[in-house]
């Protein structure tokens, strides 16, 4: 076990490179199971969840080769198992993404019910119901989803909830199904589009990704390709908020500003000077930010994965801001930890009312999930004294070398053993 120690007070200044998006890398790695030939995935972030996914594929017998620059070549010719065991799936909800590809290409799958962040109800019934509609025989027992199918059939599926992993799983399954599948109320996130681009490069026929209706014409086989993962929009937003909170000036490279327009808008509203080009964005903040109101929503709305970071920004801003969470329940646990640092936050159901204070005071805090841990690091960057963030295995699931990148920008931060 490790922790982060942060001495606040240093404005962040300089340039850093943004990593590939975890939430794009994981479904694309699952999609490699669909291809007959080897697939190479580029711009893979070096993260715990990616390592877990590679271990999961390796347990199935898939051959993986890691090249320079975190390019991963995946060859499924040696696959001999179609089981995703509990000891791997329990740490990462995205493991369920292998369910659709395994059923579609190999006709069988046994996937443990998933784990991951403790941020409310994320039921798997949408995955199961959709695959059943495509003809799969599925039972859930002994903690596993067990499925069989001769060949999946195209179906018209309306998802009760717009879910990213549900959309991705069913889209991958439909890619090799017989006939046409229509997904209604589909997630519109950029990571869904990135996955559709990968499937189409393999020879698939996916249309409408990025809209609420996706149509997939199934094909008999898919081929291996070289696919590059898109930049991490949440990492981009996190470092921009960090710079705004510390009164700094940063330039982020190898990113995609068009994917974070809602975040950039709120940062400008807070008083930051923001500029962007094709693959870069800069931010400069003079003095304290102004508090902002925001409400999370599925893409292209304000991302729930940036909510905690803006709670931290509001905590040291001038004025009062209200943050409303509409995507997940139970996602204000970071606010309780920030209160221990002196933040003035009132939780009212799905709403956090935050009155900015002039300073936060360092304290030992505990990370409860991935984005909560990031917000506590941001709070530590501006707190007086030394902040200790425990349980940072959460942050390692979604941020590549966070202490190294922050230190590169001038933060006083170090990783130490417990």
UniProtKB/Swiss-Prot annotation:
Pfam families: EPSP_synthase. The active site is at residue 117. CDD domains: UdpNAET. It is found in: Cytoplasm. The modification 2-(S-cysteinyl)pyruvic acid O-phosphothioketal is found at residue 117. The keyword Transferase applies. It catalyses: phosphoenolpyruvate + UDP-N-acetyl-alpha-D-glucosamine = UDP-N-acetyl-3-O-(1-carboxyvinyl)-alpha-D-glucosamine + phosphate. GO terms for molecular function: UDP-N-acetylglucosamine 1-carboxyvinyltransferase activity. Keywords: Cell cycle, Cell division, Cell shape, Cell wall biogenesis/degradation, Cytoplasm, Peptidoglycan synthesis, Pyruvate, Transferase. UDP-N-acetyl-alpha-D-glucosamine binds at residues 93, 305, 327. Phosphoenolpyruvate binds at residues 22-23. Gene3D superfamilies: Enolpyruvate transferase domain (3.65.10.10). Its EC number is 2.5.1.7. GO terms for biological process: cell division; cell wall organization; peptidoglycan biosynthetic process; regulation of cell shape; UDP-N-acetylgalactosamine biosynthetic process. It is an enzyme of class 2 (transferase). The keyword Manganese does not apply. GO terms for cellular component: cytoplasm. Pathway: Cell wall biogenesis; peptidoglycan biosynthesis. HAMAP family: MurA. Cell wall formation. Adds enolpyruvyl to UDP-N-acetylglucosamine. Belongs to the EPSP synthase family. MurA subfamily. This is UDP-N-acetylglucosamine 1-carboxyvinyltransferase. It comes from Halorhodospira halophila (strain DSM 244 / SL1).
